[in-house]
Amino acid sequence: MKTKSIFPLFLLAGTLLTAACATPTAKQAGNNSLEWGQVPQQPDLSWADSVGSRQMPGNHVILSANSFGAVADSTVLSTEAIQKAIDSCAVIGGGTVVLQPGYYQTGALFIKSGVNLQLDKGVTLLASPSIHHYPEFRSRIAGIEMTWPAAVINIVNEKNASVSGEGTLDCRGKVFWDKYWEMRKEYEAKGLRWIVDYDCKRVRGILIERSSDITLKGFTLMRTGFGDVRFFTPIIAR
């Protein structure tokens, strides 16, 4: 089946949408009116039907992370237990990892090929505010390859993986934004504004890198510490 890189398509979509959002006329801008005139013609996005993941993990095996020790307690770190469930699911050929309703604190999780992490309604993953719970590895930050903390959810060098459901991924990123703005004040005073973006290490929400047929569906992603969903290197999809 012919494949395409969705990264250039994202850029094309952004260009089309920007072009469609016409700026107000001088008359409109001058009277501070909320009337923006005629609605601009919407761009043709029919091409979007031909891109995206070609499949979701199909194995019907369901593993509960609670059986591996995950605890619905926001004060208890359940990273290891949830990761064990994901890894075990991948070993047996893939399937779905679920959690009982509740709040689970977690550090970096790595979704494997063939695995669907299902966040059902009533399930909330609370990202740990400690940067030490996110191991560092080589990644791309604002166009530069460097060592950076893992995201809360990572899908790297994998195929046919997904995160789905009606639950919530709360990244609780305020601690990282507070750190950034404090460092930025110091760096700006030294004329080094641009460097703070690389020196202030923060945790991203979701990282997808060098992977294919990845699905993110249904769940709520909120309060990220640095970027919501990041795609790096072309992601191959139909």
List the model feature ranges, each with a label.
Residues K217-L221, D228:
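Active-site pocket-lining segments that scaffold enzyme catalytic pockets across diverse folds
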Residues K2-P8, L16, C21-V98, Y103-N116, ...:
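Extracellular "leader-to-stem" segments immediately downstream of a signal peptide or signal-anchor
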Residues R230, P234, R238:
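Phosphate-binding glycine-rich loops and their immediate beta-loop-alpha structural context
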